[in-house]
Amino acid sequence: MADKITSREADYSQWYIDLVRSAKLADYSDVRGCMVIRPNGYAVWEKMQAALDRMFKETGHVNAYFPLFIPESFIAKEAEHIEGFAPECAVVTHGGGEELAEKLYVRPTSETIIWSSYKKWIQSYRDLPLLINQWANVVRWEMRTRLFLRTTEFLWQEGHTAHATPEESQEEVMRMIRVYKTFAEEYMAMPVIMGRKTDSEKFAGADETYCIEAMMQDGKALQAGTSHNLGQNFAKAFDCQFQTKEGVLDYVWATSWGVSTRLIGALIMAHSDDRGLVLPPKLATRQVVIIPILRGDKAAVLAKAESMAAELKENGIPAFVDDSEQNSPGWKFAEYELQGIPVRIEVGPRDIDKGVCIAARRDTLEKTELQLDATLAVQVSGMLSAMQADMFQKALRFREENTREVTDYETFKSAVEEGFVIAHWDGTAETEEKIKEETRATIRVLPEESDYREHYHMDEPGVCIFSGKPSSQKVVFAKAY
């Protein structure tokens, strides 16, 4: 119940943990750094999977599955890649009671094992493009973990594609980061800034990394998805060449892109409140709960509630009836607010006599009187659509209200404690690192979207807030998860 949840104002971090556990989304495991995703949480992941998988297939991708274990020699082939991931890797040294001749890495990501197969499959330009996605688990040995946001093992999808030209691979990189942006905004109701990472923040082994960044309710950023242009780096490491249309051998051009169960953490922190989870309707497995007020003719009330649920389900709205008598209606209201059911409908004998029922939206808690007639499904569908749109607009307003443009470092240091900061940067890794050391803020993204760039005059020349050197553009700074 909500009384088990610390308020956001009192302790935001504890609020998040309390909510995840109280809403039965996830729990700690006896395995250090790992979590158990409970049915309520996994249901959200399944909705995310279904939407993303459909979007991947609509853009020409197919699913496959590659081994969990990666030979050490494969990892070592891409020097920058192994340098980036080595500290996080789990390594298998024994199997079948004997020491292995070659160590096996538990995948932190699958570029190397996948490219060992691509080398065998790609011979000619006729084999390209190769567009494959994998749904899998990965392991990164995290020292400081937090449910959904950072765990040693997590679930994700990773796309790996091969192309004949650098132009095609760059098109793929941008196509997929736009898919992620569409998913975040249209399904998660979470506004994101799409753009490029700095060289210091890009993926190990990539030429360029693009990302989507979202603002959480505490003003911190959360990287919600990435898409990497790998150039020919992995193709060269695994000698993956193809014969071009001109009959010349060339290395293929590659991309990789992924999102993970981290999105569930983002969803929670972007929308939820002190009463519990607030779920966008598009990601709710159960969109409507009907609570019969069992007074007077109980049988008639139950029959009406069941017929309402049936009507909603016939119209594509997942609804269910809670007719249990061991808990009061008030207890049920609080429990389903905690679980984030988008719409609650209560109906009793007086309501039936008047031909109405009372519906409440989870995001606003506002109550609305609905007519108990043939338009019930249309009325509820309208509530769900309005809720989805309103949640996005609320999150967008919050981001705008908590984004500041600053021109001096002293103001920057205080502003970055409260939200996103737009400021000039001289383009050097040295300045980027010094700002990070002093404030724990990082450059989250170099925005690509023209409307965002125009709104904040990102291309105006100026001077770097830290070094005072000339700067050709502004960037987005924030503290981050």
Swiss-Prot record:
Location relative to the cell: Cytoplasm
InterPro entries, per database record: aa-tRNA-synt_IIb, aa-tRNA-synth_II, aa-tRNA-synth_II/BPL/LPL, Anticodon-bd, Anticodon-bd_dom_sf, Pro-tRNA-ligase_IIa, Pro-tRNA-ligase_IIa_arc-type, Pro-tRNA_ligase_II_C
Key word Aminoacyl-tRNA synthetase present: yes
Transmembrane region(s): none
A GO BP entry: prolyl-tRNA aminoacylation
Pfam families cross-referenced by the UniProt entry: HGTP_anticodon (PF03129), ProRS-C_1 (PF09180), tRNA-synt_2b (PF00587)
Gene3D superfamilies: Anticodon-binding domain, Bira Bifunctional Protein, Domain 2, C-terminal domain of ProRS
HAMAP family reported for this sequence: Pro_tRNA_synth_type3
Family according to the record: Belongs to the class-II aminoacyl-tRNA synthetase family. ProS type 3 subfamily.
Summary of subunit composition and partner proteins: Homodimer.
Annotated domain remarks: Consists of three domains: the N-terminal catalytic domain, the anticodon-binding domain and the C-terminal extension.
Name the record gives this protein: Proline--tRNA ligase
Taxonomic classification: Bacteria, Pseudomonadati, Chlorobiota, Chlorobiia, Chlorobiales
Gene symbol of the encoding locus: proS
